[in-house]
Design a protein with these regions (language model features):
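Membrane-water interface segments at the C-terminal ends of transmembrane alpha-helices
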Residues: 14-16, 81-110, 126-130
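An internal, D/E-rich "acidic patch" concept
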Residues: 3-61
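A general structural signal marking secondary-structure boundaries and capping sites
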Residues: 22, 89, 105-106, 146, ...
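Hydrophobic alpha-helical transmembrane segments of membrane transport/permease proteins
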Residues: 1-12, 27-28, 32, 103-122
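Residues at helix-coil transition
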Residues: 2-3, 16, 20, 103, ...
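Alpha-helical transmembrane segments of integral membrane proteins
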Residues: 38-75, 91, 114-198
């Protein structure tokens, strides 16, 4: 372990090992390599992260688009409040609430375990709330800006229906900047899923 060397050398040895995939050995799990322990659990984290990313982004796009189209109505206000609450509540708090009410009180889904799809539903929902809230707010803002653009007015002047203008022009152009958010979402979900999994 190099404990007899100066601290700066120990640090450099450790960082050098990490660059080569050697994270050391676990003291808790009978001296097993840490990299093998991470590898054994990475599949579950990736599955939860991917499910949460898909669910959060898809629902966020739908809710954000509806809020933008219904701008200034109770639908817009409700979507905004839900997005703010979704961003404000930590996912581990939501996970505990889901376990208590949906898992324990209602008995709809298993409280713990791994191996069946039903066991991933509550953790996926808990993880998806953050990306959902951000995506809904982002899409709403982007679509409101897009709907007030000149080319939207031109589409209406050409005789396109409101739904055609929204689908062909507003949605398409509002989705492009969303791609920049997916990378940070994926990283946040991979790190956040560790808390939810426990």
């Amino acid at each position: 372990y190099g404990f007899n060397k100066p601290e700066w050398q120990q640090y450099l040895i450790y960082i050098g090992g990490m660059l080569h995939g050697d994270f050391g050995t676990s003291f808790q799990y009978s001296n097993q390599p840490v990299s093998s322990l991470i590898g054994a659990r990475l599949g579950a984290s990736m599955q939860l992260g991917l499910q949460a990313l898909i669910l959060g982004v898809v629902l966020g796009v739908i809710v954000g688009a509806i809020a933008a189209v219904k701008q200034g109505t109770w639908v817009d206000s409700t979507a905004t409040v839900i997005s703010i609450i979704g961003k404000s509540v930590p996912n581990f708090v939501l996970a505990v609430l889901l376990q208590y009410y949906i898992g324990l009180k209602l008995g709809l889904f298993p409280l713990a375990g791994w191996g069946q799809f039903s066991q991933t539903i509550m953790p996926t929902i808990a993880l998806a709330v953050g990306p959902f809230a951000e995506t809904a707010r982002f899409i709403r803002t982007s679509m409101v800006d897009t709907l007030s653009s000149d080319y939207i007015e031109l589409g209406k002047a050409k005789g396109l229906s409101r739904m055609e203008v929204i689908r062909k022009h507003a949605m398409r152009n509002s989705m492009i900047p969303l791609v920049t958010l997916i990378g940070p979402y994926a990283v946040a979900l991979m790190t956040g899923s560790m808390v939810i999994e426990n």
